[in-house]
């Protein structure tokens, strides 16, 4: 099949004319040297200029990264080599290297050497460990030396291109060339080595507009590429992909297949002449330099050609070499999640085509290799050729002996046992095909599913899929698009019925063939099914699985990984990356089986599987059950106390929630349980919970709502003892114990409030409180203290005070007893009464009158409430009250609670 060269522009950096480009091996950086004398470093991920070196005022024709030294080495028209530290931007070294313009710099991959070439027709070797001394000079060219490149397969050998129309191959240590290649009619501008192990090739580009491929062992030209309309300024073999990249002064970059020499693509970004190209092993990025700036494009798919069968045998392609590894060979070695597996790799031989994809058939006996417009089916064990042919795409059926190929954009062929079984033309063409239980064909009109046996249309769906994944049972299918993925259920019984009766069949197929179970807004990169669980890697490098509407994250990946498969007996999921590293993650098959059984509502099977699930995984299962609506089962399964408590609250299981709250000793839990107990009218339990939670406000609410005077009284005493003064004050006040309220205010230093309370409810106490207030205030402001008027001394300022004394005594004598709460509807509310009118005719007893005349304070008086003696009613009420004898408020730790603090601040 033709090379699927998805070409995406990653960076466009406008600048002056670019004379050389380089890519950093580890950072996302592109180095560009400019004609104006500057050198720039661009981050192609963030699209930003990160560093600039002002080298000189003349063109900088060469610049290279030396990553192991954190250097940028530049060569310019001032004949100087400059070395900069790219972290500090400091110039480390500078020296004159040639007597004319410096054209090219090559950095030795292992030794402390750089090679430079110049218009002085010389090539020089420099050793930075020897203070940048010139170790060797290579003479032989008779014109400018435009480019030098070191042989990646032999680091002691390098080649040079010159305007003298020759290519020379040199050896370090020898000042004369090994040999010279001649064939271009004009000056040679560029040269590069083929980095693969299968061909001893060089490529060159020249002013004769031709690109030539040379066999440097036989010293012959094996191919000439024609097509550029102007001088060829750069040419390169890509170190990863089977392509040749050439750039010309005609403004185009041409991409050729390195095996067939077919022109695959032509790029023209409208930035005038192309001057340079750079690529990097391990990356699909290519940097291009133009008159008007530089560009980075990403070529092809980074997904490796790799496949694993159900038994753990992995086959992958490294360039054209096919290799195998077996997970079984690892034995019982300890495997940690996310760590690279130390696999023994076995070479299986080389493939006749460049593999773009490798895929096992369902039973693992055969493996198909696709690429270059062809497919070859091999035996998986020995890599013997079983079948081959031309195809743009290949797809296995669920039946291991069946497969389909897309011969063109209009014809799809189906094969059975390696023999053509059927050929058909889909109604709207075929842009892509997908294997599985049904044959999927994508067209401009959407996705169509066909029956493998008779190619009948099953269903047409208006969707543009990127991937389709079928479950092993054929009941579930995932259709992944560019933005989301859909989970569908395939209703095979309805399809069979419709095929027999022809009911519900339209031009778009059988209407009831699929049922949509869910749509998830996440991008699927790779995926597979285990039971009814769909496992996938996402665009944000997460390893997730989807089951029953729930997404569970297994791991966060630190780089792009591709799913290979799942081996149930190992309980492990295996993934690979583009460098062909294999890692794995634990994923218990028992958990997946349990979730699958629950999804199918097969609870008997789920109960059988449950004992095999380790305790540490039970909570994950419980969360799944909860999301499916099976909260009672989730409560039984979960081992997490927090989760169990939440479930118990939701289910109203008071006993379980109580036990968990006792174990947790958490105030928050006691409060939550108290709310539930109140909603269930379990007031005794609510009272105990509020007590454990030290929730005085809640206890007060409960006591007042139930009309429990006993509880209010004990709460008042306990709250005061523990410093919860707001609650204590309210509890006393509700009982009519205004004297206790007054004493509480005095003890807590709230003397102004105490004075107003006394004036309102206990006029006989006003004088005492005012004196205390005055004494306290005098410590701060003597003048303000003296301005306070004692009502007994200034009766003219407090009209009605004497009458208030009488009414206070009347209230004390006539309102001494409490009414039961059930009498509330019969009592006239205080706001509707005029106590001064009711008590104005009261004649105080002699003792009380004498006390007032003597200026002695009378005993405290309760707040006004309706008086009634109701022993029977009180007795019946007490029978309904909750006994609080066991409520020991003294034991409550209240050090971290201060209910009246906010009010005190107001």
UniProtKB/Swiss-Prot annotation:
Task: Indicate where this protein resides in the cell.
Answer: Cytoplasm, Cytosol; Golgi apparatus membrane; Cytoplasmic vesicle, COPI-coated vesicle membrane
CDD domains, sorted:
Coatomer_WDAD_beta-like, WD40
* Keywords on record: Acetylation, Coiled coil, Cytoplasm, Cytoplasmic vesicle, ER-Golgi transport, Golgi apparatus, Membrane, Osteoporosis, Phosphoprotein, Primary microcephaly, Protein transport, Repeat, Transport, WD repeat
Modification Phosphothreonine, positions: 861
Taxonomic superkingdom: Eukaryota
What effect is documented for mutating residue 254 to C? Answer: In MCPH19; uncertain significance
**Which residue ranges are recorded for the region named Disordered?**
837-870
Xref: InterPro entries: Beta-prop_COPA/B_2nd, Coatomer_complex_subunit, COPB2, G-protein_beta_WD-40_rep, TPR_COPA_B, WD40/YVTN_repeat-like_dom_sf, WD40_repeat_dom_sf, WD40_rpt
Gene Ontology biological process = endoplasmic reticulum to Golgi vesicle-mediated transport; intra-Golgi vesicle-mediated transport; intracellular protein transport; retrograde vesicle-mediated transport, Golgi to endoplasmic reticulum
What's the protein's topology in the membrane? Peripheral membrane protein
Positions carrying N6-acetyllysine are 627
- Listed GO cellular component terms? COPI vesicle coat; cytosol; endoplasmic reticulum membrane; Golgi membrane; transport vesicle
- Coiled-coil stretches are 866-891
- The UniProt entry lists the main location of this chain as cytoplasm
> Where are the WD-type repeats located?
13-52, 55-94, 97-136, 140-180, 183-224, 227-266
Please give the family membership noted in the entry. Belongs to the WD repeat COPB2 family.
Function (record text):
The coatomer is a cytosolic protein complex that binds to dilysine motifs and reversibly associates with Golgi non-clathrin-coated vesicles, which further mediate biosynthetic protein transport from the ER, via the Golgi up to the trans Golgi network. Coatomer complex is required for budding from Golgi membranes, and is essential for the retrograde Golgi-to-ER transport of dilysine-tagged proteins.
Self-association and partners: Oligomeric complex that consists of at least the alpha, beta, beta', gamma, delta, epsilon and zeta subunits. Probably interacts with PEX11A. Interacts with SCYL1. Interacts with JAGN1.
User: What pathology is it implicated in?
Assistant: Microcephaly 19, primary, autosomal recessive: A form of microcephaly, a disease defined as a head circumference more than 3 standard deviations below the age, sex and ethnically matched mean. Brain weight is markedly reduced and the cerebral cortex is disproportionately small. MCPH19 affected individuals manifest severe developmental delay, failure to thrive, cortical blindness, and spasticity. Brain imaging show a simplified gyral pattern, thin corpus callosum, slight ventricular dilation, and delayed myelination. Osteoporosis, childhood- or juvenile-onset, with developmental delay: An autosomal dominant disorder characterized by decreased bone mass and deterioration of bone microarchitecture, fragile bones, recurrent fractures following minor trauma, and developmental delay of variable severity.
The protein, known as: Coatomer subunit beta'
The organism named in the record is Homo sapiens (Human)
Q: By which gene is this protein encoded?
A: COPB2
């Amino acid at each position: 099949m033709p090379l699927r060269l998805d070409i995406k522009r990653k960076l466009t950096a406008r600048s002056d004319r670019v004379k050389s480009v380089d890519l950093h091996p580890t950072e996302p950086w592109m180095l560009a040297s400019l004609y104006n004398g500057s050198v720039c470093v661009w981050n192609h991920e963030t699209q930003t200029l990160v560093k600039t070196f002002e080298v000189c005022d003349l063109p900088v024709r060469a610049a290279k990264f030396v990553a192991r030294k954190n250097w940028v080495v530049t060569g310019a028209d001032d004949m100087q080599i400059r070395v900069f530290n790219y972290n500090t931007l400091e110039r480390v070294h500078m020296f004159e290297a040639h007597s004319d313009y410096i054209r090219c710099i090559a950095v030795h991959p292992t030794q402390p050497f750089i090679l430079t070439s110049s218009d002085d027709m010389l090539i020089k070797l420099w050793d930075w460990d020897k203070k940048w001394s010139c170790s060797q000079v290579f003479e032989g060219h008779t014109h400018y030396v435009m480019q030098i490149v070191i042989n990646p397969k032999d680091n002691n050998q390098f080649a040079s291109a010159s305007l003298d129309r020759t290519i020379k191959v040199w050896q370090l240590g020898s000042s004369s060339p090994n040999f010279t290649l001649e064939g271009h009619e004009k000056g040679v501008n560029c040269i590069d080595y083929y980095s693969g192990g299968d061909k001893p090739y060089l490529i060159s580009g020249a002013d004769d507009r031709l690109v030539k491929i040379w066999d440097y062992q036989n010293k012959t030209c094996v191919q000439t590429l024609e097509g550029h309309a102007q001088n060829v300024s750069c040419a390169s073999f890509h170190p990863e992909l089977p392509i040749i990249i050439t750039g010309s002064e005609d403004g185009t970059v041409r991409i050729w297949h390195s095996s067939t020499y077919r022109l695959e693509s032509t790029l023209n970004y409208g930035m005038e002449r192309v001057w340079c190209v750079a690529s990097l092993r391990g990356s699909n990025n290519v940097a291009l330099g133009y008159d008007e700036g530089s560009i980075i494009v990403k070529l092809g798919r980074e997904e490796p050609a790799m496949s694993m069968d159900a038994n753990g045998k992995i086959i992958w392609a490294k360039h054209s070499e096919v290799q195998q590894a077996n997970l079984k060979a690892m034995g019982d070695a300890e495997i940690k999640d996310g760590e690279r597996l130390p696999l023994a790799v076995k070479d299986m031989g080389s493939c006749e085509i460049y593999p773009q994809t490798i895929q096992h058939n369902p039973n693992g006996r055969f493996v198909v290799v696709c690429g270059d417009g062809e497919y070859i089916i091999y035996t998986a064990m020995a890599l013997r050729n079983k079948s081959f042919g031309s195809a743009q795409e290949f797809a296995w059926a669920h039946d291991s002996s069946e497969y389909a190929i897309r011969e063109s954009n209009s014809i799809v062929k189906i094969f059975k046992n390696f023999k053509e079984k059927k050929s058909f033309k889909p109604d709207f063409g075929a842009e892509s095909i997908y294997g599985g239980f049904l044959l999927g064909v994508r067209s401009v009109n959407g996705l169509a599913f066909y029956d493998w046996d008779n190619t009948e249309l099953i269903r047409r769906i208006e969707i543009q899929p990127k991937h389709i994944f079928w479950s092993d049972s054929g009941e579930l299918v995932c259709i992944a698009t560019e933005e989301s993925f859909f989970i569908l259920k395939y209703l095979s019984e309805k399809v069979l019925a419709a095929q027999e009766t022809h009911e519900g069949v339209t031009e778009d197929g059988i209407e009831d063939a699929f049922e949509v179970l869910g749509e998830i807004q996440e991008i699927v990169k790779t995926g597979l099914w285990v039971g009814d669980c769909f496992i996938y890697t996402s665009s944000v490098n997460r390893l997730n699985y989807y089951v029953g509407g729930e997404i569970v994250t297994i791991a966060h990946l630190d780089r792009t990984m591709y799913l290979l498969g799942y081996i149930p007996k190992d309980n492990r999921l295996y993934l690979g990356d583009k460098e062909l590293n294999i890692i794995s993650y634990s994923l218990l098959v028992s958990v997946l089986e349990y979730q699958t059984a629950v999804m199918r509502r097969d609870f008997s099977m789920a109960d059988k599987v449950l004992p095999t699930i380790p305790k540490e995984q039970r909570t994950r299962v419980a969360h799944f059950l909860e999301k499916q609506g099976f909260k009672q089962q989730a409560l039984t399964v979960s081992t997490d106390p927090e989760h169990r408590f939440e479930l118990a609250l939701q289910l109203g299981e008071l006993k379980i929630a109580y036990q968990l709250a006792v174990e947790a000793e958490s105030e928050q839990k006691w409060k939550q349980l108290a709310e539930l107990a109140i909603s269930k009218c379990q007031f005794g339990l609510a009272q105990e919970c509020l007590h454990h939670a030290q929730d005085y406000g809640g206890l007060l609410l409960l006591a007042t709502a139930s009309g429990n005077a006993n509880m209010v009284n004990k709460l008042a005493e306990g709250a005061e003892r523990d410093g919860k003064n707001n609650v204590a004050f309210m509890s006393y006040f509700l009982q009519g114990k205004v004297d206790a309220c007054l004493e509480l205010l005095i003890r807590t230093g709230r003397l102004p409030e105490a004075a107003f309370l006394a004036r309102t409810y206990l006029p006989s106490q006003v004088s005492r409180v005012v004196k205390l207030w005055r004494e306290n205030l005098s410590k701060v402001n003597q003048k303000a203290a003296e301005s306070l008027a004692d009502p007994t001394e200034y009766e003219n300022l407090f009209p009605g005070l004497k009458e208030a004394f009488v009414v206070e005594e009347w209230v004390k004598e006539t309102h001494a007893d409490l009414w039961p709460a059930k009498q509330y509807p019969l009592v006239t509310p205080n706001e509707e009464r005029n106590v001064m009118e009711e008590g104005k005719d009261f004649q105080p007893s002699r003792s009380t009158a004498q006390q007032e005349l003597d200026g002695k304070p009378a005993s405290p008086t309760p707040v006004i409430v309706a008086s009634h003696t109701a022993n029977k009613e009180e007795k019946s009420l007490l029978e309904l009250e909750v006994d609080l004898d066991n409520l020991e408020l003294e034991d409550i730790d209240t050090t971290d609670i201060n209910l009246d603090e906010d009010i005190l601040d107001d």
